[in-house]
Each structure stands twice: as C-alpha cells, then as structure tokens.
Design a protein with these regions (language model features):
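A compositional/biophysical signature of low hydrophobicity enriched in polar/charged and small residues
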Residues: 2-181
C-alpha cells in the first residue's frame, strides 16, 4: 500500500513524496512532485508557448506583477520544474540521420545506460521495461556516422547483448508544449 507525505519544500512549492515499499525504494528514492497553482500553470504554459516571452507580458497574462513572475520563474527553474533552452533543428545543422536504438543488456543496465549517455551523438537515454532494456536517441551526420556509432561503439560496450535501430524517416510531431495538466 502506498501513502504519501505532503509538506512544504524549501522552494515554497507543495511537494508530495511517495512512500514505497523497500523493493521499489531503489527506483523511487528521488521522486518528488511539485504541485502548481493555477497561476504557476499559466506561467509555465506562457513559457511553453514562447520561452523568450518577457516577464512583463507574462505578468499581464496571469495577473501578477513582473517581479512576482520573475521570482516564480526562478523558483520553477531552481526546483527543476522548467528549463528554458533553445531547441535546434538537427537537419538545419547538418545532422541528416536520427534514430532510436533499442538496446538489450546483460548485466548492470545502469552502467550501460550511463556509458551511452556519455556519447556525444546520444541526446536521450531511458531505461525501460519491455523488449529493450534501454532506448537511445542518436543524432548523426549521415548513415555512415550512424553505422559507426551503433556498429563500432554502442555494440562494443561491455554488457550490450544486442541492438535494434529504428531510423527516423519523417518526423510528424515533436512538441514541447504538453502543458501542465
């Protein structure tokens, strides 16, 4: 049975930290959720629409002062709730081949995932449950670069049993504005 601890965190947000059985502790030890009020959600949605939007514009939209918005955004960033970054288009930068690589692992999955995360071509690594132990997104200059990455570097890692590569043919959707629900 799972219960939750609710309390005020150091950053001023309400936090919920799940209490789990010992068998799940390893996976959930760092899980902390931030509950946003309606104004916090509105600020996040404004920034998801345009990460360069001024604090003054956001303040008008959400009904706060510019200083209050600036403080809330700073707290959201410090809490790790949001990041404000430039998202590039790999094709425009000469990276014409992207792929998802499913990796099956013998041994310590975390060690393999950490080694994959160190590769500069890899921009996404997730440990999964299912057919693959790890999924990796790779951004490469061309097919030869992808072949070298998968064939010579990923498959050569100790613990990698097999890989399956899913080459991206045409991107149909990639959004970062899923909201705050």
């Amino acid at each position: 049975m799972q219960s939750a601890f609710r309390g005020r965190s150091d950053n001023g947000f309400m936090s919920i930290r799940p209490r789990r059985s010992a068998s799940l502790e390893r996976v959930t030890a760092t899980a902390t959720h931030v509950l946003l009020d309606d104004v916090g959600k509105a600020i996040v949605e404004q920034l998801q629409d345009d990460g360069r939007r001024s604090y003054a514009t956001i303040a008008r939209a959400v009904g706060l002062s510019e200083a209050a918005v600036r403080q809330r955004v700073a707290r959201l960033q410090e809490a790790g709730v949001i990041q404000i970054v430039a998202v590039t288009d790999p094709l425009q930068l000469g990276f014409r081949r992207q792929a998802m690589v499913g990796v099956r692992v013998d041994g310590d999955v975390v060690v393999v995932a950490d080694a994959l995360a160190e590769m500069p071509e890899v921009d996404y690594v997730v440990i999964t449950a299912g057919s693959f132990d790890v999924l990796v997104e790779a951004v490469c200059e061309d097919d030869d670069h992808l072949l070298e990455l998968v064939g010579r570097r990923i498959r050569a890692l100790p613990g990698v049993r097999s890989t399956e590569t899913f080459v991206y043919m045409k991107l149909r959707k990639q959004h970062y504005n899923w909201g705050t629900r």
